[in-house]
């Protein structure tokens, strides 16, 4: 079987209006993919930046996949949340990005969005916080049910991902 | 004796902890160590180091230059657990006690070549107001008992941090027998090496 190593970091996020941010992340793959070692989901620390407006998480990712096919190439999905001084959490953005398919080092910028909801919900979010969230997290990385949503832009999550491929040339796959 | 089918690959890292930007602090020193997986073992060089105390430059850069060498070689059979360098920066507080001014970690670049990395440095924060007050009153900041936790992904959801500086690292990476073991590391990149050699405020 061909092997893929995904080694890198969720560096941080820019462009969010909230200041104390953290990120829940996960990786979704097709049925032909098997995770040999590493954790496929996690949550970063909460960062309150003192200089500049970028929140830094430096969250390490180290995953080792074996695959029998190319279908279902890994997708990273992200949820950015903000935490206020009382420890309450509010959704700031959803986003996903495909793990790059060429070996080497990649800088990824993942744009995010959040559901808007009705005008009542928007008004409530502006005054008391909270706001609508997705019931099914798979909407983040699948395109199937998106057409029903009305969304607003969030900030951008920055990732530095290195990719190592093994035995792809043995099967004639050019990445 | 060059074996026809090697089972081990080597990763040689040279480089330096070049400089740092900490707008609020001065007279800092830096410790580094490496964190790596079970299949990895160092074969040569030093995997820990502690730098001199550097003061800020008296110019617009306000740079803390350490110019501290890194030279280590690892061997492994599996890229999982690829080495990360963990940095911790310390400096004196108003009473002259050494307190931590930042932790940071980054993976050693995967592909051979020359790489520059600017890594954000953060300190843990007290979670409760009472702890905040006592740490302010006693003049003791929260610290990690083992700095190596910053290289781990698990258990982070309980920590709150404050990022307050950057350290610039330079790596020269050489690998041996990765190709023979069937790994494709991609093209040799020199990402971020071009351009000025000292950090220019906040990297994006």
UniProtKB/Swiss-Prot annotation, chain A:
InterPro entries: C2_B9-type_dom. One of its GO terms (molecular function) is gamma-tubulin binding. It comes from the Eukaryota. GO terms for biological process: cilium assembly. One of its GO terms (cellular component) is membrane. Disruption phenotype: Mice expressing reduced levels of the protein in the central nervous system and kidney develop perinatal triventricular hydrocephaly, polycystic kidney disease, lack functional intact cilia and die at the time of weaning. Residues 2-118 form the C2 B9-type domain. Highest expression in thymus and skeletal muscle. Also expressed in spleen, kidney, lung, heart, microglia and liver. Detected in brain (at protein level). Keywords: Cell projection, Cilium, Cilium biogenesis/degradation, Cytoplasm, Cytoskeleton, Nucleus. Disulfide bonds: none annotated. Pfam families: B9-C2. It is found in: Cytoplasm, Cytoskeleton, Cilium basal body; Cytoplasm, Cytoskeleton, Cilium axoneme; Nucleus. Its main location: cytoplasm. Component of the tectonic-like complex, a complex localized at the transition zone of primary cilia and acting as a barrier that prevents diffusion of transmembrane proteins between the cilia and plasma membranes. Belongs to the B9D family. Part of the tectonic-like complex (also named B9 complex). Interacts with TUBG1. This is B9 domain-containing protein 2. It comes from Mus musculus (Mouse). The gene is B9d2.
Curated annotation (Swiss-Prot), chain B:
It holds the Pfam family B9-C2. Disruption phenotype: Mice display impaired cilia formation associated with renal cystic dysplasia, as well as ductal plate malformation of the liver and polydactyly. Additional phenotypes, occurring at varying frequencies, include randomized heart looping, holoprosencephaly, microphthalmia, cleft palate, ventricular septal defect and thinning of the myocardial wall. Depending on their genetic background, mutant mice die between 14.5 dpc and P1. It comes from the Eukaryota. One of its GO terms (biological process) is cilium assembly. The keyword Cytoplasm applies. InterPro entries: C2_B9-type_dom (IPR010796). One of its GO terms (molecular function) is hedgehog receptor activity. It is found in: Cytoplasm, Cytoskeleton, Cilium basal body. One of its GO terms (cellular component) is centrosome. Residues 9-127 form the C2 B9-type domain. Keywords: Cell projection, Cilium, Cilium biogenesis/degradation, Cytoplasm, Cytoskeleton. Part of the tectonic-like complex (also named B9 complex). Belongs to the B9D family. Component of the tectonic-like complex, a complex localized at the transition zone of primary cilia and acting as a barrier that prevents diffusion of transmembrane proteins between the cilia and plasma membranes. Required for ciliogenesis and sonic hedgehog/SHH signaling. This is B9 domain-containing protein 1. It comes from Mus musculus (Mouse). The lineage of its organism: Eukaryota, Metazoa, Chordata, Craniata, Vertebrata.
